[in-house]
C-alpha cells in the first residue's frame, strides 16, 4: 500500500479546503491499514502455522504396505514444505507502505505482525515451466462429407481471424472499393417490386398489353422506373404464373394418390436411399418408367430366390425332358394353373408398384413387395398372363439360348465357352477407364447421372466428362460406357487384376457378382464378415482407430492406435463440400494463419474440414510421409481415402504429402506467410497407381 501524494492537487484550493482534504486522506489511509492488519495478517499467520504442523506430522517414510507414500508432497522431488517470509513486519517500507513520520499511528497490541521465530527461512521454490497446449478450433464430427449450407458461405461477408491473440479482419482497401462498386451496380440494376406493384403490372399487361408504347411509358412514369425493368418484370411474372397454372392443371388431372407418388418419386434419392436428399438434389435425374427398367434384369447367372422360384422349376423340368435321341431341350415349363390363383385388388396394386420399382423381375417383386402373399412362380405366371400379347419377357432370350445347347457338350468346350464369355464382358473397358488402366494420372470430373434413353452417344454428360455410366444413369444396361463390376473370387479384390481396383473404384454389391454385403457370421447362409470383399472399406466404414495428440511438427497431430501394413486403409477424409470460389475465399484466412484443411475433390467441389470433419483433418504435411491420399469412386461419388505408404508402427504420427507447389501458400514450403494476396492452397489426391 502506498500513501497517495496529492500535494500538486491542492495548489488551486484555498488553504482551509486543502487542510480538510488532507485530513480526510490521512483518516482513510489509517482505516485501510487497520482493516488489513485485523483481517489478513492473522489469517496468514494461522495458515502458515497450520502447514508447518501438518508438514512436521507427515511421515516421509513408507506406508503400511512398505511402498512409497502416495501423498502429493512426498512424491515431489523438492516439496514445498515451508513458506518463505520475512520476520520483519515492522518495515512497512519493504511492504510498500509510506507513512507520515509526524503522524502517530496506534496499532493493536494483540495483533501479531510477524510469524513465529522458529520458522526457518528457506529459498523460494520455482515451479517448472509447462508448455501450453496448441491452439485448437471447435469443429463438428461427421462420418461422411456434406454439402455446405448456403448460410455458411463466406463470399461477400466479413471474415474475422485471430493471429497471436489479436482479432483481425480479413479485408483490404481494394476489396472494400470493389464491394462498394458492386453494391452500387446492384442498386442500379436490380429493382424490387412489391406484391401490389406486381399485381398492378400483371393486370395492366393482361388487360391492355405491353406492346403499346403509350402504356409502357405511362407505367414507367407512374412507377418511376425504366421501361426495360417493367418489361423484364412482366416476363418474370408471366413465366411464374404460367408455371403455377401448369402445375395446378397437372394436379387436377391426377388423383391425390398418383400426385403423391409422383412427388415422392421426385424427392427420393436413389443413391442415398432417403427422401429429400441435400447431397444429390440438383444432380439427380428423373426416374425412368417401368418399360425402361425391364432391360436391367437378365436371367444370366441368376440363382433361384426360393423353393417356389420359377428358375428352379424350369431347371428341374428341363432336366426331366432331355431326350437321348433328340438334340433339343423341351421348351415346356411346368407351372401351376393361373386360374387356381386368385389375386385381390390390393395384391394387383402391389404387383404394379413392384413392376414399376424392380422391373419385370418376379424374384425381386416376390422378395420385396409380395413377400408372404404370393410366390415367385405365381408372380411369374401372372406376369405372363398379363403381358402375353403386349410384352415379351427377357426370359425368352435365355430360353432360346438353352434350346441350342445339346446333351453331348464336352467338358473342355463348356469351360472354353465360359472363359470366352467372361473375357468378352471385361476385355472392353469404357472410354473413361483408358487413362487409369494405362497408368496415367487422371483428374476426375463431377459425376452427374445421364438421362439417355438407350445407349449413350456424344451428347451424354458421362462421356463428355470422361466418367463411366453408373447404375443410376438412365441408359440401358448394355451401354458401352457402363461399368459392369468385377467377377473376382471372394476376398481377392486386392490387386490390379480386379477391374474395380484397377479403376480406383470400390466394389459394388449390386454390380460385382462375388462381392456380397453382409453383417452376419455365416450361420444363416450369408457370407461371413471375415471373408467379405476387401475393396469395400468406404461402404463398410472400416476406419482405423486414430488418436489425437500434440504433434512434434505443428499443433495437433494424428497418431495410429495399432500397427498398420503397407497400403492398408486408414479412413476417409471428410468435411464440407464447397465450390472452388468458396474455397478460394476461405483459403485467404488459411494463408494468414498458416494452416489448411482444404482438399481438392474434382473439377467442381473441394472438401473443407475446418468446421466439419473427422480425426484425419489433423494429419500434417511431410516431404517423407508414411501415408498417401487416394481418390476413389464409391457408387458414383468421388471420395478421398487415406492409406499407409509403408508399414507403420503403433503410436506413430501420421503424415502425408499435401502436394503443394510454387503456386501454393508460402507457409506450406517453410517460408513466412505473405501479408497480402491469396493463393491456391488446396491439397490434391495422389494420381492413380
Curated annotation (Swiss-Prot):
Domain SANT: 339-389
EC number: 2.1.1.356
Location in or out of the cell: Nucleus
Annotated PROSITE patterns: CXC, SAM_MT43_EZ, SET
SMART domains: CXC, SET
Distribution of this protein across tissues and organs: Expressed in unpollinated siliques that contain maturing gametophytes. Not expressed at early stages of floral development during early megagametogenesis.
Keyword hit for Cell cycle: no
Domain SET residues, every copy: 544-659
Assigned GO CC terms: nucleus; PcG protein complex
Functional note: Polycomb group (PcG) protein. Catalytic subunit of some PcG multiprotein complex, which methylates 'Lys-27' of histone H3, leading to transcriptional repression of the affected target genes. Required to prevent the proliferation of the central cell of the female gametophyte by repressing target genes before fertilization. After fertilization, it probably also regulates the embryo and endosperm proliferation and anteroposterior organization during seed development.
Family named by the database record: Belongs to the class V-like SAM-binding methyltransferase superfamily. Histone-lysine methyltransferase family. EZ subfamily.
Protein name (Swiss-Prot/TrEMBL): Histone-lysine N-methyltransferase MEDEA
Source organism (scientific name): Arabidopsis thaliana (Mouse-ear cress)
